[in-house]
UniProtKB/Swiss-Prot annotation:
The protein's enzyme class: transferase
Gene Ontology molecular function: rRNA (guanine-N2-)-methyltransferase activity
Membrane-spanning ranges: none
GO CC terms: cytoplasm
Coiled coil location: none
Recorded superkingdom: Bacteria
Protein task: Specifically methylates the guanosine in position 1516 of 16S rRNA.
Recorded catalytic activity of this chain's protein: guanosine(1516) in 16S rRNA + S-adenosyl-L-methionine = N(2)-methylguanosine(1516) in 16S rRNA + S-adenosyl-L-homocysteine + H(+)
Residues engaged in binding S-adenosyl-L-methionine: 98-99, 114-115, 150-151, 168
Protein name stated in the entry: Ribosomal RNA small subunit methyltransferase J
UniProt record similarity statement: Belongs to the methyltransferase superfamily. RsmJ family.
Database matches in Pfam families: SAM_MT
EC code: 2.1.1.242
Amino acid sequence: MTRIFFNQQYPTLVDISQRWQLEFDKEAEFELKFEQNQLSLHKRDEPKLDGIVVDFISGAVAHRRKFGGGRGQSIAKAVGLKQGVTPTVVDGTAGLGRDAFVLASLGCKVIMVERHPVVAALLEDGLRRAYDDAEIGAWMTERMSLFPGSSLEALAKITDAVDVVYLDPMYPHRDKSALVKKEMRVFQSLVGADLDADGLLTPAMTLATKRVVVKRPDYAEDLDGIKPSMVIATKKNRFDVYIKAAMK
């Protein structure tokens, strides 16, 4: 079980801890709080850091949904979004769900897979609020769902027809920007790097009927040492695309 600190007098937090099999530990490095109708994760020895929340309604993700370039974005091109083609996507390494949300906002049905129970709890809480939102709730309910568990398990268990598997394994970041530093510091100390990421490509290729997309920092080697069919480069990252069949 994952150890976490939380206020045991708060029924909502007790329910969440039981649901995700989180074990209370007064010495734990991380704390879960439930305030203003949202679940947040805090690093206890860095109280000045804001809590990490999954928020699909406001902030950076909402701004990107409204002004982020639509289907012209690199991620949209990578998964094969085009006129008349809106693929079903499994995001095998969901994290805070930002890339999954971008794809869902562009029309894709997205199944998010997340193996760390604390991160999955944050995702579930973000989905709960998004499903209830007047502006995005209807299409979020239709398009975005969560499959808790490891990618290796999920890729074997998911029975839906899946066009694309999207992978963004946690990789040691060099970026020194404040946001990346904050979130990656907290995240990497919580979940660690995805040391088994190389093992994801083969099951992903088995599940995807059309393609597998792997997001990598520009300095990272190819996943599992396998050269992609094509690469879409951005300023700091790249999307390695492994094509099985044409998008149609």
